[in-house]
Amino acid sequence: MKTIVIGGAGFIGSLVSQELIASGREVTVVGRRPPGAHTAALPYGYRCADLGNRAQMREILEPGCEVIDLAYATVPKTSYGDPAFDLLANLPGSVGLLEEAVAVGVRRLLLVSSGGTVYGPSCTLPIAESHPTAPISPYGITKLTIDHYALMFHHTRDLPVVVVRPANAYGVQQRSRTGQGFLAAAIDSILSDREIEIYGEVGTIRDYIHVSDVASGILAALDFGGDGDIYNLGTGIGASNLDVIAMLCPLAASTGRTIRVRHLPSRRFDVEANVLDAQKLRSACGWRPDVSLQRGLTEMWDHALTTSSTP
């Protein structure tokens, strides 16, 4: 089976590509830049191309192939500074990909959305796929709009689409200074002897899911998900910023480091709590996350200590 992974050299995409290769698929990764050191050695084809270039997408897609779309040009925090850019940098290319997928006749297109932003403030926890969607960030609004376009193409043009909505992914390859990823940023602050900044009394509550579990969930949805369906990928367990810091305290103490916290006023654009219910995918195929937050956080800490610079 030929599988094309757009955005497959990134933080999540590189793990997805490895899962696909292990499943016996022939994988082609599409990225805007040459592959990094952690992906260059993997046995797959690589194409430098831009999602926004429809001619390039038309050339890369093949009849009967699978497509996984992980490409996105912005992050939630920076989307507030230029909402128009967030929209224009992401929506046209995503819609163009859907059109090209219909034209070429792909076997299935899996869209990676955002479980952490599209639902907005929670009515109940954990959040199921049927929860109302009311995003309060430009990033979440654009992500949800792309979801709607994908489902519209399924209903009106028979495009076989599956949408997955991961919670907050983390892992050792996550960069700490991109404006996305509290765990990596907190570890970086400790190792750099800087204050960890949290907004509000305890910070936000998030469902942290290890990137390897996101990758296995994407593969499970690709293989067992229903066309036109949406699946959350999460642990169902929430942790506040202070909970995370409490887990980091013994790790820091073991190396003689101290943790300093700076409390800042709450921000209006932060969703207070986001915890996902992934029972739908579990019922479909038995998928469940494997890595606990404590285990994953320790893995990140140990990796940060053994690298030449902070994460």
Q: Locations of the language-model features?
A:
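N-terminal Rossmann-fold cofactor-binding loop
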Residues: 30-34, 51
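A hydrophobic alpha-helix adjacent to the NAD(P)-binding/active-site core of NAD(P)-dependent oxidoreductases
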Residues: 46, 86-87, 101
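Catalytic helix-loop patch of NAD(P)-dependent Rossmann-fold dehydrogenases
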Residues: 81-96, 108, 117, 121-163, ...
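NAD(P)H-binding glycine-rich loop region in Rossmannoid oxidoreductase-like domains
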Residues: 51-89
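Rossmann-fold cofactor-recognition segment
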Residues: 42-53
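C-terminal substrate-binding subdomain of Rossmann-fold SDR/epimerase-dehydratase oxidoreductases
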Residues: 190-311
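N-terminal Rossmann NAD(P)H-binding glycine-rich loop of SDR-like oxidoreductase domains
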Residues: 3-22
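SDR active-site strand-loop-helix element
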Residues: 6, 30, 67-73, 109-115, ...
